[in-house]
């Protein structure tokens, strides 16, 4: 395996001949791919590729699947320092934990948090992550540097709240100028793709919601916001505006194909129709529903209606295989069992919405998400020589049900090997872990975090459980 790693780490062209390639139409044997200048320049039968590229020495990987990297349709890279503080907490943890924590981070801690989260993304097979924006003041550049240093492709949201929810609230005209500057700065970056965000509709004025959505649409980038996740937020919207959050966005004309709505779990049939009619997209975050949500998004119904959606972690757990398993499992538990639906979309649906479907909602359908000529060479080499994949009859289902991140041998973005068997090949990840362990406690202690429950040891001693 060390020989394979050495060959994959080179800077020249690669001709890879894996046992299987996961193409948009499904896994295929007897294929080969050529990676040149960071993109897939040829995907064809091994015979055709070797004939047309006689100068390249094929690298045989008979026990591996070459598949697209996962695309996390919704995450928060600057929340990794507090990720273990939210277990068992009631809804709207952003008010008590995330806003206070992120708002207290200085530039260095934003960098460390984002770098740690980006490393976790790559370890979990995510070659791309859609970040909803940091609430820290003026440190989005540190987040971008961290993601770039690790080699994670990222869609980075610039938060445009004008009524609250961040460390500092500039005037509306300043926010819009900063948003324009954000779009301009990263418009042609090879790994960083700009996006605009409003944390939740209630922390922005109607004028800002409409302006930011329109700006994103005109620029061809994604506008992100969280909607219909918690019952209390839906009720606040009804009281303040007379409409549910998605209904209010539709009323303002702020929905559209540029819009990516995180969660959309408490959603009515009318709101589903609004999403379908406007072409708006959803980040389906199944693990977030399990850990801290009020409901499960009706993803199968969205698929049947033609509503675009991709799978997101919401910063919960960076493992693309376990995310797919949770996505299918929650649809089965929440909807399939009651209707006798034994397929619940099938393995192919969840593979698609974790890769190309997620790239689509992220605004990156022409950039990544598939093994296809002209797209960025963002891919995984998954070891199929494992008990979990033996015997193999239906690889797409098997990846959803039996896949795990420890089966990923190599992670590539832009044609460059970033991780080998879970660890970076060109920087010291363990030094990062030591630095985070040394400084995270101080950062947490400084933040005005409010937890409702004590940590597990205190729970045990107080008699909450035996």
Question: What residues fall within each predicted segment?
Answer:
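Active-site microenvironment of metallo-dependent hydrolases
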Residues: 1-31, 35-41, 52, 352-466
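Divalent metal-coordination and catalytic microenvironments
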Residues: 19, 33, 38, 63, ...
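Active-site gating loops and adjacent loop-to-helix segments of metal-dependent hydrolytic enzymes
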Residues: 81-112, 151, 158, 163-173, ...
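Alpha-helical scaffold segments that flank or form the walls of functional sites
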Residues: 83-152, 175-188, 437-448
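Metal-coordinating catalytic core of metallo-dependent amide/deamination hydrolases
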Residues: 138-265, 270-272
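His/Asp/Glu-enriched, well-ordered alpha-helical/loop segment
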Residues: 251-258, 300-386
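A conserved active-site cap/scaffold subdomain adjacent to cofactor or substrate pockets
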Residues: 269-270, 276-312
């Amino acid at each position: 395996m060390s020989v394979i790693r050495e060959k994959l780490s080179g800077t020249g062209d690669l001709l890879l001949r894996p046992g299987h390639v996961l193409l948009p139409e499904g896994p295929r044997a007897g294929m080969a791919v050529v990676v040149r200048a960071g993109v897939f320049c040829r995907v064809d039968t091994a015979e055709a590729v070797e004939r047309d590229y006689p100068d390249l020495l094929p690298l045989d990987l008979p026990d591996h699947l070459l598949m697209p990297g996962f695309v996390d349709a919704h995450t928060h890279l600057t929340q990794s320092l507090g990720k273990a503080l939210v277990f068992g907490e009631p809804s709207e943890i952003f008010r008590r934990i995330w806003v206070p924590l992120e708002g207290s981070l200085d530039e260095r801690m934003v960098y460390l948090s984002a770098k740690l989260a980006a490393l976790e993304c790559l370890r979990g097979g995510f070659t791309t992550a859609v970040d909803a924006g940091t609430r820290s003041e003026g440190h989005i550049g540190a987040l971008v540097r961290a993601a770039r240093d690790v080699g994670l492709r990222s869609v980075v949201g610039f938060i445009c709240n004008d009524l609250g929810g961040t460390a500092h609230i500039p005037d509306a005209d300043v926010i819009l100028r900063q948003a324009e500057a954000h779009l301009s700065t990263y418009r042609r970056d090879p790994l960083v793709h700009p996006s605009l965000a409003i944390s939740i509709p209630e922390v922005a004025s109607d004028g800002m919601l409409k302006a930011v959505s329109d700006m994103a649409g005109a620029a061809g980038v994604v506008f992100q916001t969280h909607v219909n996740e918690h019952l209390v937020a839906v009720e606040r919207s009804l009281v303040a505006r007379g409409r549910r959050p998605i209904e209010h966005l539709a009323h303002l004309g702020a929905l559209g194909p540029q819009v990516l709505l995180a969660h959309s779990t408490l959603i009515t049939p009318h709101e589903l129709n609004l999403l379908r009619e406007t072409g708006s997209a959803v980040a389906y975050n199944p693990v977030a529903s399990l850990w801290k949500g009020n409901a499960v998004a009706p993803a199968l119904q969205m698929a049947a209606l033609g509503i675009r959606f991709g799978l997101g972690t919401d910063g919960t757990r960076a493992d693309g295989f376990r995310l797919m398993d949770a996505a299918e499992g929650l649809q089965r538990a929440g909807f399939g069992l009651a209707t006798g639906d034994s397929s619940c979309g099938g393995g192919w649906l969840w593979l698609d919405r974790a890769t190309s479907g997620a790239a689509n909602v992220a605004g990156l359908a022409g950039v990544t998400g598939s093994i296809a000529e002209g797209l960025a060479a963002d891919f995984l080499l998954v070891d199929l020589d494992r008990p979990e994949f033996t015997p193999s009859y239906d690889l797409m289902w098997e990846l959803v049900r039996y896949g795990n991140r420890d089966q990923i041998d190599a992670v590539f973005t832009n044609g460059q090997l970033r991780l080998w068997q879970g660890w970076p090949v060109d920087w010291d990840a363990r030094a990062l872990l030591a630095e985070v362990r040394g400084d995270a406690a101080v950062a947490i202690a400084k933040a005005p975090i409010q937890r409702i429950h004590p940590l597990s040891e205190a729970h045990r001693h107080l008699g909450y459980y035996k």
